[in-house]
């Protein structure tokens, strides 16, 4: 039975490769990201994973898209992440909070 795969950060790299694998299996793939996924057939819900209001809007869009009883199993792959280029001792609190918001909270 085809699954519904929800991936964060499928706009490039490992996330896009994972999206391609799910698509190759015949699954429905939804990308949660600020940018579109380059894989044909992947639906994108534009989201800033570090922003609470954006996440709330995304949850509403997913609920509307999937309904109360999705057809098939649902898989969530939280792949999105941010990486700082500066050393920890020169990283601002705001930058660290942004990384935690995307990598952990989002």
Regions found by a protein language model. Name each.
Residues 25-39:
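Conserved glycine-rich Rossmann-like NAD(P)H-binding loop of the short-chain dehydrogenase/reductase
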Residues 4-7, 73-77:
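Conserved hydrophobic beta-strands of the Rossmann-like cofactor-binding core
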Residues 79-84:
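Conserved NAD(P)H cofactor-binding loop of Rossmann-fold oxidoreductase domains
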Residues 87-88, 92-97:
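Substrate-binding pocket helix/loop in short-chain dehydrogenase/reductase
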Residues 40-53:
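Rossmann-fold cofactor-recognition segment
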Residues 50-67:
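Conserved Rossmann-fold cofactor-binding substructure of NAD(P)-dependent oxidoreductases
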Residues 11, 19:
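N-terminal Rossmann NAD(P)H-binding glycine-rich loop of SDR-like oxidoreductase domains
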């Amino acid at each position: 039975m085809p699954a519904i795969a929800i991936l964060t950060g499928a706009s490039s790299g490992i996330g896009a490769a994972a999206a391609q694998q799910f698509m190759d299996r015949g699954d429905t793939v939804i990308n949660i990201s600020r940018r579109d996924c380059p894989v044909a057939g992947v639906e994108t819900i534009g989201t800033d994973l570090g922003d609470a209001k954006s996440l709330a809007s995304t949850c509403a869009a997913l609920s509307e898209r999937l309904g109360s009883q999705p057809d098939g199993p649902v898989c969530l792959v939280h792949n999105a992440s941010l990486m700082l280029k500066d050393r920890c001792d020169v990283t601002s609190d705001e930058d660290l909070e942004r990384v935690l918001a995307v990598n952990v909270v989002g």
